[in-house]
Amino acid sequence: MTAIDRDRARAAFKSYTDAYDATNPRIALKIEHTYHVAEACDAVAREQGWSSEDIDLAWLCGLLHDMGRFEQLRRWDTFKDAESMSHAALGIEVLFGENPADAPATTNIRDFIETGAHDELIRASIAYHSDFRLPAQLDERTRCFCDIVRDGDKIDIMRTIADSTVDTILKVDEDAFLASRFSVPTLAAFDEHRCVARDERNEPADYLVGLICFMFELVYPASRALAREQGDIHRPVSYTHLRAHETGAYL
């Protein structure tokens, strides 16, 4: 298996994202999130006993999983796929297709890894990382890499939410967030110990329930251990203003 040059991949990622406005807190958030997901994938793969080559590949898949977010924010000023397009599909376009003529930067998968031997696996790990469920027809190896990226993404989203404002994440001010209530489908997902589907989130507060539900569907034991060790899942629901509010009272 061809070795992956992490320095080359980091440099390619930085070169691409430097063209976007890192003073925008939402761009900065996604850059930081990307690095954290890559490291989470590395940590989980190591703890699960993967080979050194597969650890590197898991790290790279984590680094590339959100490549579509930067164009999504530039074109539509939102992270909501329903109000723009699938950021996963956009990431595939950026890495494996043609970049738009007005994009501030262009890149290609070959900027990150010389060989094309892993292209289909990398493509799948990006394409399916935010899907509610993985396709049934995936082969076992591809599913393993998709699972580790999805786990790494969930783990760091917990940190991201805890460290960010609701305006940065949802483009909703705090008053509107606190005025919202949990919707019935979201609470049903919580009671069923499963993730919340996008079309089940009807209120800003539902995003918080969805975050907590991530813990139910982490695949790897090492992912669950890492999430518990980091403790980020507890921080959003420990805020004083949430504890005093109906939203916090339910949790």
Residue ranges and their predicted role:
Residues 27-60:
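Alpha-helical phosphate/pyrophosphate-handling elements in metalloenzyme active cores
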Residues 50-218:
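Divalent metal-dependent catalytic cores for phosphoryl transfer on phosphate-bearing substrates
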Residues 2-19, 63-68:
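Short alpha-helical hairpin
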Residues 12-36, 70-81:
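Active-site flanking loop/helix segments enriched in acidic
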Residues 216-227:
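Short helix-capping/linker segments at secondary-structure and domain boundaries
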